[in-house]
Amino acid sequence: MEGAELIIQEIHREAEQKIQYILSEAQREAEKLKEEARKRAQSQAEWILRKAKTQAEIEKQRIIANAKLEVRRKKLAVQEELIGEVLSAMREKLAALPDDEYFEALVSLTKEAIEELGTKKIVLRSNERTLKLIDSRMEEFSEKVGVEVSLGEPIECIGGVLVESPDGTVRVDNTFDARIERLESELRATVAKALFG
């Protein structure tokens, strides 16, 4: 009996060892799987975090770009409004020049046009006020500009003169409107620089 008991004990001991070995291997495998799962989870969490940071940076850049565009758009709108006000004030000031000052300006504008036309006879066109002013001082005006002057039909303008050859084939537009238009881009740059640096 004793031999059978020894065999049973030996079988128990071997079985116990196998159980311990299997449990320890299972424990080791479980730890290994747990560690791999933790690393995968950490790696995935880092990837999600990187992706979120990238998306946040892209969104931040988009918001900044949109804000800059909005600021630029508003700045241009203000600039256009102010330039419009400056041009409007200039037109009002030119339209309200006192007669004596305006007469001398008309002489100067006409002489400038005569140089371009190179003719001894001219036809002047302008608004009603200008034509009446020149007509009331025609002898003085003709003498100052040095050519024969006749008056044409009135035109829509704030002032200045449209000077034509007698046959109307050549003309120099020295109305205030045309001169402002010719100077407008330069004036815009000057006003923009003065207002916005």
From Swiss-Prot:
It comes from the Archaea. It is found in: Cell membrane. Keywords: ATP synthesis, Cell membrane, Hydrogen ion transport, Ion transport, Membrane, Transport. GO terms for molecular function: ATP binding; proton-transporting ATP synthase activity, rotational mechanism; proton-transporting ATPase activity, rotational mechanism. InterPro entries: ATPase_E_C, ATPase_V1_Esu. Component of the A-type ATP synthase that produces ATP from ADP in the presence of a proton gradient across the membrane. PANTHER family: ATPASE H+-TRANSPORTING V1 SUBUNIT E1A-RELATED (PTHR45715). This is A-type ATP synthase subunit E. The gene is atpE.
